[in-house]
Regions:
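Histidine/acidic residue-rich metal-binding segments in metalloenzymes
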Residues: 1, 100-108, 130-162
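N-terminal hydrophobic targeting/anchoring segments and the immediately downstream early-domain regions
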Residues: 1-133
Length: 162
């Protein structure tokens, strides 16, 4: 699609892992070979991108630190967005949500959406790739969902098993 054609379209993309690429590989959000960059996004009439703080299973034991690092990356790289570009912050994988106060603090830092798992079980819920179809939300997971509803954080169910 050429630039003139793109100027006619508005995009709302609900997921990308670009924050991990920027954080881990030292890439620039301005222009990169990751999922999206500001240069490509600014070619559209309007572009809203949801940036995921993806908590890979290798970070399971330090999920909160990883979530905070990616949140910091988001804020560092989205301070001066082009006028037609909007950025939304999400969490993909609830390993960093170790308490309701942590959840509320992520919300205060701008997290608007959270996926409770990423395919595998954690302390909040069972994941999409798990065979235990009867597990669903844990007791803590139920309190997390209730708190998310209370504070207005959207629940992404795409990687849950039930």
């Amino acid at each position: 699609m050429n630039r003139d054609t793109k100027n006619n379209y508005s995009v709302f993309d609900t997921h990308c892992d670009t924050l991990c690429c920027v954080r881990d590989d030292g890439k620039s959000l301005n222009e990169n070979d990751c999922h999206v960059d500001l240069k490509r996004m600014s070619e559209y009439k309007s572009y809203t991108q949801v940036f995921a703080c993806f908590i890979d299973p290798i970070y399971k034991t330090c999920g909160a630190e990883r979530t905070m690092n990616l949140t910091d990356t988001f804020h560092t790289h989205t301070q001066n967005l082009p006028q037609n570009v909007k950025a939304v912050l999400s969490i993909e994988g609830g390993e960093g949500i170790y308490s309701l106060s942590a959840l509320r603090n992520y919300h205060r830092l701008g997290v608007k959406i959270a996926a409770l798992t990423w395919n595998y079980s954690n302390h909040i819920a069972s994941g999409a790739l798990e065979s235990d179809e009867n597990r669903g939300l844990t007791d803590f997971g139920k309190t997390v969902v209730a708190e998310m509803n209370k504070i207005g954080m959207l629940i992404d169910v795409s990687h849950l098993n039930r």
